[in-house]
């Protein structure tokens, strides 16, 4: 198989596997009567992220449980989509949803083939550190390293360090995306992981489309805005160097679409909307901790547009707690201390002081 044919095959595989839970959520909501495109896209993104974090915890419980969960998520999504009878759903809304789906696939293909236009598919993760930028640290490999450990070992032992990084230092959502698709075919070179990483990073396109629809821009303006963002330095560098910043952006953008949309006055009194909003914010934090810098002003904007009810706030708090508490417990109990990035960014302190562990290379690190 030629390099380009292999890339195309992997691209289609990971687009389909990533999109299945999202498509099921959107079609089910449409069948139940929801017609708002921004809300349907927000639901789709939330379903995608929730499937990934569910897979992460299933693998952590036991690798066999994780693999069963991965197959059930994929096959269950296919069955659910069939049962939704898309041919009987609102064609006009389906056409509106097809546009961001097509742009997501197009954006993924653009980054993948631009990244490998000069070859390098035999060592993709190293290529990604220099392809569009000055040499970057190997942070793009961290989720792959820990995903392999959980895939083989679950919670049976504490994962070994990657360089100086503990498994608790970075949120687990991208690890979860890897684990959902690992059983369907993988490799040792990292090419599967790289293509999947690009596909997941490009979910920002769906989130941004939701924002542009909520802002009631015309289709031409939406297309121009998305195209400009796709070819920007941020879109290309962070799209190919697959650390999970753009995944987090997708969820924050979807939450923003809820706040700025014309339905906010109704949504701020709906517990279901509270659960969706909190899930998007929680998934953003489980993708990248820097999401807090977007979520805090987003909460201020939501309050300015109309304070939610106490019931809404309570529902949101419970959903956020359900998503974030297990990871916080893991950080504190399974692989402490879990706060090294905060100490580093605020206090300039990175060393692990209270334990000695062995890195994958076998050298002792303090």
What are these regions (language model features)?
Residues 237-248:
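Short acidic/glycine- and proline-prone juxtamembrane loop motifs at membrane-interface regions
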Residues 57-67, 234, 275-304, 320-331:
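Transmembrane helices and adjacent periplasmic/lumenal helix-loop junctions
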Residues 52-56, 312-366:
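Membrane-lumen/periplasm interface segments of specific transmembrane helices
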Residues 258-275, 293-321:
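Perimembrane helix-loop-helix junctions
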Residues 33-43, 188-195, 202-231, 250:
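Transmembrane-helix signature of polytopic, membrane-embedded enzymes
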